[in-house]
């Protein structure tokens, strides 16, 4: 498979990435988990770039393809809430008293 890094850099939507890499996907899954798939994919790209500085563009694109496939597969069996990729899911709520913290008299 021959991919072009310049074409890759112009891609914007999740569907464009799947089409570029010719990966099959369920549009319903992408529609529901789009931001989460792209966030996971973006984090993977950063790791790939950091850990494979000597890799050729073709090798990196192959790794990117695998990363997109893995990011998608996570959300076939999991939900965005379970994955907690975004900061808002990791923040502890303020001014909340948990029921377990209420002492009974």
UniProtKB/Swiss-Prot annotation:
<protein>
    <recommendedName>
        <fullName>Nitrogenase-stabilizing/protective protein NifW 2</fullName>
    </recommendedName>
</protein>
<keyword id="KW-0535">Nitrogen fixation</keyword>
<dbReference type="Pfam" id="PF03206">
    <property type="entry name" value="NifW"/>
</dbReference>
<comment type="function">
    <text>May protect the nitrogenase Fe-Mo protein from oxidative damage.</text>
</comment>
<dbReference type="InterPro" id="IPR004893">
    <property type="entry name" value="NifW"/>
</dbReference>
<comment type="similarity">
    <text>Belongs to the NifW family.</text>
</comment>
<dbReference type="GO" id="GO:0009399">
    <property type="term" value="P:nitrogen fixation"/>
</dbReference>
């Amino acid at each position: 498979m021959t991919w072009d890094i310049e074409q890759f850099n112009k891609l914007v939507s999740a569907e464009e990435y799947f089409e570029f890499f010719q990966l099959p996907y369920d549009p319903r899954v992408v529609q529901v988990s789009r931001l989460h798939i792209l966030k996971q994919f973006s984090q993977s790209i950063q790791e790939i770039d950091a850990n494979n500085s000597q890799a050729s563009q073709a090798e990196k694109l192959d790794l990117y393809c695998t990363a997109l496939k893995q990011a998608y597969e996570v959300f076939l069996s999991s939900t965005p809430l379970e994955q907690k990729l975004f900061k808002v899911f990791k923040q502890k709520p303020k001014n909340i008293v948990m029921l377990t913290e209420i002492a009974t008299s």
